[in-house]
């Protein structure tokens, strides 16, 4: 509880500091505001808030199972092996951020072919990054992690490989989450988050109890794969629906 309160306090202080630091860079005035509009905005953003929470939960569900069935040493090993997954997400973020505005403009202007092309290129870039890191992890991952953390992780190379595959699925799911948000179908994401979280909650303890760290890695990877596939199906469904609706509009 102390850590949570400290985190909240630091966040509030940082917010105040940044507002004071940047207040002269922006000039705007608010003459009036509508509580109804604010309420609608909060309702529209609710799936994004819940999704951010559940994304974190998907990564932590195997850790909860490890905490219940394995030793603290195994928990530490899993944390060490999980570190390279953040590299995939970091690099994919560099690919994703520059094209967000472009994707939004293309979708709003009904340029569906160009929109689909950019989506494909983003998935291709994420897949390429994931494959490069997976290859590097297979060759150097465990030796480097063993050197960094001062423990012998060489016997867990298969666990690292599975986790890196899961990291790739996670990055693809994040891309699809952004695409669905741009398409204004963020509520559809709740199905993906719900099913993936249910899988992680139910099967993480079973897999960890029977397979140890490999079970935790499989639970993480399968949960992210489920999330990615559901999001991808929704994207294809809504894209096809949008294209059909445009084709049905009579030309003037």
Which residue ranges define each predicted feature?
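Interfacial transmembrane-helix starts/ends
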Residues: 42, 79, 111-128, 135-140, ...
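Interfacial segments at transmembrane-helix termini and the short loops linking adjacent helices
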Residues: 72-74, 139-168, 214
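Interhelical loop/hinge segments that connect adjacent transmembrane helices in multipass membrane
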Residues: 1-3, 16-59, 102, 106-114, ...
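Helix-loop interface residues and adjacent transmembrane-helix termini in multi-pass membrane transporters
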Residues: 69-72, 182-184, 210
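Alpha-helical transmembrane segments of polytopic membrane transporters and translocases
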Residues: 47, 62-64, 76-92, 125, ...
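Membrane-interface junctions at transmembrane-helix termini in multi-pass inner-membrane proteins
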Residues: 1, 165-192
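Helix-loop junctions and terminal segments of transmembrane helices
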Residues: 81, 85-110, 179-182
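Hydrophobic alpha-helical transmembrane segments
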Residues: 1-24, 194-199, 213-237
């Amino acid at each position: 509880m102390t850590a949570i309160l400290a985190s909240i306090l630091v966040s509030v202080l940082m917010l105040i500091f940044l507002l004071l630091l940047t207040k002269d860079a922006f000039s705007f005035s608010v003459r009036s505001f509508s509580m109804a509009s604010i309420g609608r905005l909060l309702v529209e953003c609710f799936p994004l808030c819940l999704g951010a929470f559940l994304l974190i939960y998907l990564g932590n569900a195997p850790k909860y199972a490890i905490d219940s069935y394995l030793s603290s040493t195994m928990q530490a090993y899993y944390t060490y092996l999980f570190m390279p997954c953040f590299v995939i997400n970091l690099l994919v973020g560099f690919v994703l951020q520059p094209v967000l505005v472009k994707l939004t403009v293309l979708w709003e202007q009904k340029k569906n072919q160009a929109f689909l092309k950019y989506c494909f290129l983003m998935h291709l870039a994420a897949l390429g990054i994931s494959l490069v890191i997976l290859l590097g992890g297979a060759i150097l991952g465990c030796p480097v992690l063993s050197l960094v953390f001062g423990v012998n992780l060489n016997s867990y190379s298969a666990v690292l490989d599975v986790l890196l595959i899961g990291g790739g699925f996670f990055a693809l799911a994040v891309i699809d989450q952004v695409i669905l948000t741009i398409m204004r179908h963020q509520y559809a994401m709740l199905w993906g988050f719900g099913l993936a979280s249910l899988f992680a909650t139910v099967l993480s303890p079973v897999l960890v109890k029977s397979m140890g760290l490999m079970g935790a890695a499989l639970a993480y990877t399968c949960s992210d794969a489920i999330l990615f596939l559901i999001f991808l199906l929704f994207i294809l469904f809504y894209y096809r629906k949008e294209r059909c609706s445009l084709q049905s509009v009579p030309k003037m």
